[in-house]
Amino acid sequence: MNGVSSRKVIYAALPRKLVAILTLAAISCVGAIIGGVGVASAQEVESNKMNEILNFRQYSPTFASAGQPTREQLQIIKDSGYERVIYIAFSTVGPAIPEEDQLVKALGMDYLHIPVDFNNPTIRDFNTFADAMQRESDRKTLLHCQVNARATAFSFLYRVIYQDVPVADAKRDMNSVWTPNQVWKDFIFSVLAANDKSPECEGCDWSVPEPR
């Protein structure tokens, strides 16, 4: 007796109600598989859209930094599961969105603004950011400024000081966006020193770019 005819005999011997239950279960399994593929595809699309934000960098499942997102990209940030947006530049310069706080809150995300002077960043600025991160360290957070210069520097410091990321790895991520100038090199070194951390690492070059 071949396999097909064997299956026919087995199903014929089963009660009709049981056959119906087995059929529904099989349909449900197929639906779940198809649904799972759909969810994965949607998440992948959202991730790709996040990469369209200026200089977007993802450090962990709950922490990323970027330059200034557009109004439309704020919705993408929300759809990608972010719960908090921290902005560390002035709201009156460049591509800043003056009403960003209102837009972010309207989308159901938390918003924190720490206006950091690019020409005079302070340890207090960084500590304000770090304190907020430490209070709710599990909240998925996007840190941003205008072009992700301030934000990558703050991200470098936070990851090295609070997440024990090797200096070389964190510096490589920062340098993929920019090389800090003398003001920011001095700032980074002072924050590291205040937290008993060294900027030195094998292969690290902290040379500053030539002034333009």
PLM features per residue range, with description:
Residues T141-F154:
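A phosphate-binding catalytic loop at a beta-strand-loop-alpha-helix junction
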Residues N2, I27, G31, G35-T141, ...:
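Cys-dependent protein tyrosine phosphatase-like superfamily
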Residues G3-A26, G35:
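Bacterial N-terminal signal peptides that target proteins for export
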